[in-house]
């Protein structure tokens, strides 16, 4: 077998040619490097022992699932498709995504000072365009067409570009934010406190949302805002296939989980109304 560093470099090139996103490449190479350093061999039996080792060290099924994806890609890279097929991911229970109510989104926006245009825009883009946090941070000025009200999300999950229409209100917010900036950064959102205006980091987005969420009394994450976008669209009667395209889901089944959220929303509304109970009580 080649030296681990040499193998990892070749594996990175393979993943790039496969069209994997930079985030996926980083994740896969991290786990494969750990596997090789652990002394893993090129077979599913060795990989299963590695997974058992990780489980003993506290890895959840969800985390192990990511490791399996990385190792299967690595085995295919080595031309061992049969070994890749033998390596099955552990079952991960699919929990319903948690969405904020519209009132909670309003509360969140209300605690952001008017002078913090960037912070307000972060919330509006995650909720109003359904972006992933990595997509938000990677947006460049050239990806936004304010006149036509469009955002081009480049290299989303699966390294696929998609076009997301935005309402005039959101386009105006973007324009106001850009007019308040004097830097020459190519990125739509930048770090505020640094002299050199680098692109905004995902970690800072999480931090900002946590801080504003505490002020508003709302538990919020970037994913929750994206989930809220999808759930509220569905509640307004938007076709699920349109929501699939807006979210950038390759499979409709991934989007269909939101129908369960909406059914629960309807069930609660029905239980609150108590129509039958009131009828039978009369």
UniProtKB/Swiss-Prot annotation:
CDD domains: INT_XerDC_C. This is Tyrosine recombinase XerA. The lineage of its organism: Archaea, Methanobacteriati, Methanobacteriota, Thermococci, Thermococcales. Its main location: cytoplasm. The active site is at residues 132, 157, 223, 226, 249, 258. The keyword Hydrolase does not apply. HAMAP family: Recomb_XerA (MF_02055). Pfam families: Phage_int_SAM_1, Phage_integrase. The keyword Transferase does not apply.
């Amino acid at each position: 077998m080649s030296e681990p560093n040499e193998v990892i470099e070749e594996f990175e090139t393979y993943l790039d040619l496969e069209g994997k996103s930079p985030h996926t490449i980083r994740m896969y190479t991290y786990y494969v490097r750990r596997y090789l350093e652990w002394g893993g061999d090129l077979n599913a039996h060795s990989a299963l022992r590695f997974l058992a080792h990780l489980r003993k060290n506290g890895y959840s099924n969800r985390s192990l699932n990511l490791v399996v994806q990385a190792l299967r890609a690595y085995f295919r890279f080595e031309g061992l498709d049969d070994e890749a097929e033998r390596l099955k991911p552990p079952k991960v229970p699919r929990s319903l995504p948690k969405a904020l109510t519209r009132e909670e989104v309003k509360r969140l926006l209300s605690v952001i000072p008017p002078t913090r245009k960037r912070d307000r825009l972060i919330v509006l883009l995650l909720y109003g365009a359904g972006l992933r946090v990595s997509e938000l941070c990677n947006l460049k000025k050239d990806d936004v067409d304010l006149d036509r009200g469009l955002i081009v999300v480049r290299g989303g999950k699966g390294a696929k570009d998609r076009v997301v229409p935005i309402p005039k209100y959101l386009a105006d917010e973007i324009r106001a934010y850009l007019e308040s900036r004097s830097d020459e950064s190519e990125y739509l959102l930048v770090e505020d406190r640094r002299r050199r205006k680098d692109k905004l980091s995902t970690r800072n987005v999480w931090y900002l949302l946590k801080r504003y969420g505490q002020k508003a009394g709302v538990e919020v994450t970037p994913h929750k805002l994206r989930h809220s976008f999808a759930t509220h669209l569905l509640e307004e009667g938007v076709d699920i296939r349109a929501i699939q395209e807006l979210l950038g889901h390759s499979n409709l089944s991934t989007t269909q989980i939101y129908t369960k959220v909406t059914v629960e929303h309807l069930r609660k509304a029905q239980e609150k109304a108590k129509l039958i109970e009131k009828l039978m009580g009369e």
